[in-house]
A protein has these predicted regions:
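Substrate-binding rim/cap in mid-to-C-terminal beta-strand-loop elements of soluble/periplasmic
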Residues: 1-32, 36-51, 141
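Short, solvent-exposed loop/turn segments at secondary-structure junctions
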Residues: 2, 38, 59-62, 79-81, ...
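Active-site rim elements
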Residues: 2-11, 25-30, 59-70, 116-119, ...
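Residues that flank catalytic or metal-binding motifs in active/ligand-binding sites
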Residues: 13, 34, 50, 70, ...
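A generic secondary-structure signal for well-formed alpha-helical elements
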Residues: 24-29, 42-46, 78, 83, ...
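Short conserved micro-motifs at the rims of enzyme active sites and ligand-binding pockets
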Residues: 65-68, 85-86, 92-95, 141-144, ...
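Core domains of carbohydrate- and sulfate-ester-processing enzymes
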Residues: 79-116, 181-198
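Long, internal low-complexity/basic segments
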Residues: 112-128, 133-198
Length: 198
């Protein structure tokens, strides 16, 4: 049913994958699922699926992660808004201990300004980020403080806060409680690590 080589720029989320698989398999999609099937997009019957897609990330309790650094984001067709809960904390994860990242660090120490900028951008994140992703797909130019985009930023921020409320996401409070929702063995290990690193 799907044309070979089909492509789409429709925005979908991970939560949409399960209902899509269910529909493809001829199963019944329960109303309590968070996602919506994008089977019609795959079939070429629709060109779009959602007006906004949302993202979340935590470093709390993950491999090589900061003690806590929560990130939430929302994207529309043209713009992306990112909310970083703790901009005063250095962002860390498994990538910051990778061979590639270490090679950037080595270059930065040797005076390579490009490498130094990449490291700084990755580890030191501002409270808000806003990108015009059609013109800036790699998100280099943060427009969060640009007055010309203030209305677009405010609109996406409202959508993000609405979504967080709908999900019961209390922002930093949810981040700090993350360890309580992990397995006991992992939880005790991560609580000790969090206490050791402050």
């Amino acid at each position: 049913q799907v044309s070979p080589g089909s492509k789409t720029s429709a925005m979908v989320e991970y939560v949409d994958v399960l209902p899509t698989f269910l529909e493809v398999a001829g199963g019944k999609i329960r109303k309590n699922l968070d996602g919506r099937s994008f089977f019609d997009v795959i079939l070429g019957k629709k060109n779009s699926h959602k007006d906004y897609v949302f993202g979340e990330m935590t470093t709390r309790g993950i491999n090589k992660g900061s003690s806590y650094f929560g990130i939430r984001s929302v994207r529309s067709e043209n713009y992306k808004y990112i909310l970083n809960f703790t901009p005063d904390v250095t962002f860390q994860n498994a990538c910051t201990t990778s061979t590639i990242f270490k090679s950037w660090s080595k270059k930065a120490l040797a005076g390579d300004n490009t490498a130094a900028e990449k490291i700084s951008r990755y580890e030191n994140r501002p409270a808000e980020e806003f990108y015009a992703i059609q013109e800036d797909p790699y998100e280099w130019n943060n427009l969060a403080d640009d007055y010309n985009y203030a209305m677009h930023k405010a609109k996406l921020k409202r959508e993000l806060l609405r979504w967080m409320k709908e999900c019961g996401d209390k922002g930093q409070q949810t981040e700090l409680e993350a360890l309580e929702h992990q397995g006991r063995k992992r939880q005790s290990k991560d609580i000790k690590r969090a206490e050791d690193t402050g």
